[in-house]
Amino acid sequence: MSKRIEVNDLNVYYGKFHAVEDVSLTIEPRSVTAFIGPSGCGKSTFLRTLNRMHEVIPGAYVEGEVLIDGNNLYGAGVDPVLVRRQVGMVFQRPNPFPTMSIRDNVLAGVKLNNHRISKTDADDLVEGSLRGANLWNEVKDRLNLPGSGLSGGQQQRLCIARAIAVSPDVLLMDEPCSALDPISTLAIEDLIEELKNDYTIVIVTHNMQQASRVSDRTAFFTIAGTGKPGKLIEYNDTNIIFSNPSAQATEDYVSGRFG
């Protein structure tokens, strides 16, 4: 688990609209990388290109390369379903399957991929995934109850458990704490710090303090105006981005002068 991501000259389009322009960067394994920038700058769109989730929108396509340990996710014959198994996604709002039990939520991805699994192996996978998401001790006595009955923070950790149950190499998180209270946010941030020991993690956040707390490296995106493509302005170690950025636009954003 945990893979290196290399992006070369990536451009993202929705039909004729150029959404993200000419991004190149490398994300090292077992690290947390934060994408920051104003609304509409393309950071979430770019995040979705890392597991081809943007393709659910009709007319979406990319030019350029996304390599995971040297393998191009956009190569001829590459199955997007297999890509999304390798590169998991946690969304902005917790989205457990409301009619499924906690246990079945964890196993949902495994069953979707048609993996046959014994009850013993399933039990072990459920426990291991919930432990990996720091949720086991809170739910071990109610695994057969609906996941929708959990608190917001617990639901988000359940979604993380569901994501890691299929053994991905990379975890993408699109503003995973934006709908959570401060205590639940802290629990997710602590979990991210633990998960990076096993996964490559990329997180989109509007919270500058969160980016500075959880990430090793930070990419700042911005946009010149309505209808213009988002651009990567600066990518560096997080402490440099927040203390001594090279671009004036980065300094203006992280210091709160705009954005």
From Swiss-Prot:
Protein EC: 7.3.2.1
EC class (word): translocase
GO molecular function annotation: ATP binding; ATP hydrolysis activity; ATPase-coupled phosphate ion transmembrane transporter activity
Keywords carried by this UniProt record: ATP-binding, Cell membrane, Membrane, Nucleotide-binding, Phosphate transport, Translocase, Transport
Positions that bind ATP: 37-44
Domain spans labelled ABC transporter: 5-248
A single GO cellular-component term on record: plasma membrane
The reaction(s) this protein catalyses: phosphate(out) + ATP + H2O = ADP + 2 phosphate(in) + H(+)
Subcellular location, record wording: Cell membrane
Membrane topology per record: Peripheral membrane protein
Pfam families, per database record: ABC_tran
GO biological process: one example: phosphate ion transmembrane transport
Family under the similarity heading: Belongs to the ABC transporter superfamily. Phosphate importer (TC 3.A.1.7) family.
Function of the molecule: Part of the ABC transporter complex PstSACB involved in phosphate import. Responsible for energy coupling to the transport system.
Name recorded for this polypeptide: Phosphate import ATP-binding protein PstB
Organism: Leifsonia xyli subsp. xyli (strain CTCB07)
Encoding gene (name): pstB
